[in-house]
Amino acid sequence: MDAFQSILKFFLNQKTAIGYSFMALLTVGSERLFSLVAFKCPCSVENTAYGLVFLFAPAWVLLILGFFLNNKAWRLFTGCCMNPKKIFPRRRCCRFFYVLGHIILSSLVAPVMWLSVALLNGTFYECAMSGTRSTRLLEMICKGKPKECWEELHKVSCGKSSMAAMESEEVRLSLQAQSQILGWCLICSASFLSLLTTCYARCRSKVSYLQLSFWKTYAQREKEQLENKLLECANKLSERNLKCFFENKKPDPFPMPSFGAWEAASELHSFHQDREHYSTLHKVVDDGMEQTPQEEETTMILVGTAQSL
């Protein structure tokens, strides 16, 4: 039992890495499925459009899904049309762009994975480049090749070119090599950017490493208990209302947070150095509806916590 609990604790502690690993495997599987089942290069002048659509359209869809599934985005934008001060509060206009940048970076993970895998495979890029009409690109691809390469490059990816089989294969391998080089460049650039943003966020942190660890633990526990409490209160309220409806009697008072409390607890957390609140809910409970001076607050985002609800 102790061994099982240790293993379970390890996986819970590494759930972010496990989640990204699962996303990577899912991306690889999806790309292979697209390549084998759905992708059929037309071997015509439409190669470029067809290849680029298969390369970038899934990445765009994944980006949109990333926004849809990011609870922090909905927490930021819910009610903003009715009250623009929610996203552009007084003296903290930059806060919106800071949070939005974090949301965009989080949503870019899946699209970058797709583009990296697709470029490393090379199928979509090969089809797209074989349909190019750019003189500069044709000079680069068909350098040292017969004139058939210029005229029938769009047929190379299907093996229908009148060029010698060896020369046609050389062109295909060259296009695949270019695709893989771009794929590795994208992976290296994304990894370096991720490292830079993480280092910058840690260097700008207003709390120590141990306090940050405590903050993460607290926020995770609050998230779990909040979900349970919401379900429990919803069950009790619905049970009370149904019972009173069918028994035709007046309901007993049911204590619930006020509208203002719901609004305050739904805001993104702003860390205050003098008053250590580890979440917006923590701040609302301690201060009630009293607002902390805006100019003394520092926006800090804790990834994967109750702030993502």
UniProtKB/Swiss-Prot annotation:
InterPro entries reported for this sequence: CALHM
Stretches that traverse the bilayer: 16-37, 46-70, 100-129, 175-200
Keyword entries, A-Z: Disulfide bond, Ion channel, Ion transport, Membrane, Transmembrane, Transmembrane helix, Transport
A GO BP entry: ATP export
Entry GO terms, CC: membrane
Principal localisation: membrane
Binding site for a 1,2-diacyl-sn-glycero-3-phosphate: R32, V37, N121, R202
Highest taxon above the source species: Eukaryota
Compartment annotation: Membrane
Biological source species: Mus musculus (Mouse)
Taxon lineage: Eukaryota, Metazoa, Chordata, Craniata, Vertebrata
Cytoplasmic side: 1-15, 71-99, 201-309
Subunit details: Oligomerizes to form undecameric cone-shaped channels.
Function: May assemble to form large pore channels with gating and ion conductance likely regulated by membrane lipids.
Protein name (database record): Calcium homeostasis modulator protein 5
Disulphide bridges: C41-C127, C43-C158, C142-C149
UniProt topological domain (Extracellular) ranges: 38-45, 130-174
Membrane topology: Multi-pass membrane protein
Gene it is expressed from: Calhm5
A Pfam family assignment: Ca_hom_mod
Similarity comment: family membership: Belongs to the CALHM family.
Keyword presence, Transmembrane: yes
